[in-house]
Amino acid sequence: MAEEFSNTTHESFNFTLHTTLGVTTKLVLPTPAEPILPVQTGEQAQQEEQSSGMTIFFSLLVLAICIILVHLLIRYRLHFLPESVAVVSLGILMGAVIKVIEFKKLANWKEEEMFRPNMFFLLLLPPIIFESGYSLHKGNFFQNIGSITLFAVFGTAISAFVVGGGIYFLGQADVISKLNMTDSFAFGSLISAVDPVATIAIFNALHVDPVLNMLVFGESILNDAVSIVLTNTAEGLTRKHMSDVSGWQTFSQALGYFLKMFFGSAALGTLTGLISALVLKHIDLRKTPSLEFGMMIIFAYLPYGLAEGISLSGIMAILFSGIVMSHYTHHNLSPVTQILMQQTLRTVAFLCETCVFAFLGLSIFSFPHKFEISFVIWCIVLVLFGRAVNIFPLSYLLNFFRDHKITPKMMFIMWFSGLRGAIPYALSLHLGLEPMEKRQLIGTTTIIIVLFTILLLGGSTMPLIRLVDIEDARARRRSKKDVNLSKTEKMGNAIESEHLSELTEEEYEAHYIRQQDLKGFMWLDAKYLNPFFTRRLTQEDLHHGRIQMKSLTNKWYEEVRQGPSGSEDDEQELF
């Protein structure tokens, strides 16, 4: 009845407009849009909610077990074992136990233990990438920015072309399974993402050359973003079905797409970071740390969503945003928010990394595999060869322009430290290859390569460093049991806040410029950019910051000392 009345009213209104205006063309109002309804309703929605709840429970359970494992590694000083290796091994063990439980038909957690690529790229990867940029040692990074960029951009592209081209031509020769050119390049791009978590932990423990440490660490940070952009480029070419386009046109379009993604995303992230610095410089939120911290969290995730929304790389944008916010915005924060931001990012990044490595181990039993021994062996050979073609020629080229030369021993360690990690694994699951057997072959091969590099190469890095005698003299005098490979323990002990310094910004700037022979961007940054984007701290600001920290610490300490009966230990004070 209501529908008939609505239709009658609609038609009469059209007729009224028609007669009133005296036009010859009938005026028709647009049909009302259909209401937006939930995708799942009723019993189906309830089942979806239950499934999501079990997935969350299972993920948190895995994380809790991994945290206990890391705690045991720290407590019993098993510092020779990197946390990533231990977590992957635990994931493999848990996957085997779940497989036995499913075989005995005691429970079915098949859906919960499956890794979802969208969850990785939307929830897990952004905090990891942002934290790596935010905690970056800016001095060593910018002093070696040319070398790092060459290895991360051109080196990754070389490795991707070597692996992708090798797979394509071996397939054409019927040595391994055939893949077309774009699929081969996509696999070469995703498998070129290095993640030397275990190697960096060993470098820090043995105090190797800081230049070597920064070259490997800096390359790995930019390399992740470059690898994702290259993989997206190959996928974009696949979606366009460019089989009738010449090779040169394909290459030129791929290059244009890559340059747009790389520089556009980097510019967006840099601009967002600079805007955040200006906002928090001119809007003083230091007296309300909760609002200040909330604004930082918003600006941290903002470039990722914007970049993905305009078809750029969110990972590249959030990386550069993290670097810029750490360099400028961080110094506009109150001391409480500075420390809170560092510890929160480290905690969230640790949880995300642990979750990814655990599910990487679980995937051995949960992922539908297609194993081809010749394909796996040739891919491992090509990965190692592509890394060598990347590192050694570029290192020799850079030595013509560097004062601090990259020695052959350092080149060898850089080649050996090309571990693969979570990003190749997630990218392999994200590829939309057809048929399904091809996707399973790529996924299985990627998992094997990742485990091979983490367990074998990562586990043998410390003996190799001792063998080639590249460690610092202090570390050489230590016994093996004193070497600490715990990233969690090291990062938990690091607290940085310039508010705890005794120098004002002007005094520190004058002292820094006087002590350092700054050139190029470093001089420009210290002279003009840093004063423009950061708040100038006076002695009064420093004094107020120290008082605030002491007051809050005493307050927290008193609350911690509060006994169950409500009594306090007033005799002891922290300060």
UniProtKB/Swiss-Prot annotation:
Keywords: Antiport, Cell membrane, Cytoplasmic vesicle, Differentiation, Endosome, Golgi apparatus, Ion transport, Membrane, Phosphoprotein, Sodium, Sodium transport, Spermatogenesis, Transmembrane, Transmembrane helix, Transport. GO terms for molecular function: potassium:proton antiporter activity; sodium:proton antiporter activity. It is a multi-pass membrane protein. Its main location: Golgi. Intestine and kidneys. It catalyses: Na(+)(in) + H(+)(out) = Na(+)(out) + H(+)(in). Expression and activity are regulated by acid media by increasing the rate of trafficking to the apical membrane. Inhibited by HOE694 and S3226. This is Sodium/hydrogen exchanger 8. GO terms for biological process: acrosome assembly; potassium ion transmembrane transport; proton transmembrane transport; regulation of Golgi lumen acidification; regulation of intracellular pH; sodium ion transmembrane transport. The gene is Slc9a8. It holds the Pfam family Na_H_Exchanger. It comes from the Eukaryota. The keyword Cytoplasm does not apply. The modification Phosphoserine is found at S565, S567.
